[in-house]
């Protein structure tokens, strides 16, 4: 997979300090991100391919099911139009 994910032009990733959570701001919609989703999306800057993102997260979180879950998560967000 040579796709280098990046947020859609209309999407903005923000951290809500009051709630202590990350938010994905979209036109007419706000998505509250849970767990490490915000951290994963911060790596989606267009400079890394999916395998590079997986490798970086696998190193940061040994034993976590990164290789199985992250590509699936990114693909789902791409289908929603939140990543390109």
Q: Which ranges hold each PLM region?
A:
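Long, charge-rich, low-complexity alpha-helical segments
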Residues: 29-84
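Acidic, low-complexity/disordered tracts enriched in E/D and polar residues
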Residues: 1-42
């Amino acid at each position: 997979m040579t796709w280098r994910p990046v947020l859609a032009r209309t999407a903005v990733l923000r951290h809500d300090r009051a709630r202590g959570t990350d938010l994905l701001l979209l036109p007419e919609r706000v998505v509250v991100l849970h767990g490490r989703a915000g951290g994963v999306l911060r790596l989606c800057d267009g400079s890394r391919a999916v395998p590079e993102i997986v490798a970086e997260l696998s190193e940061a979180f040994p034993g976590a099911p990164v290789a199985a879950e992250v590509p699936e998560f990114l693909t789902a967000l791409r289908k929603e139009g939140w990543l390109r």
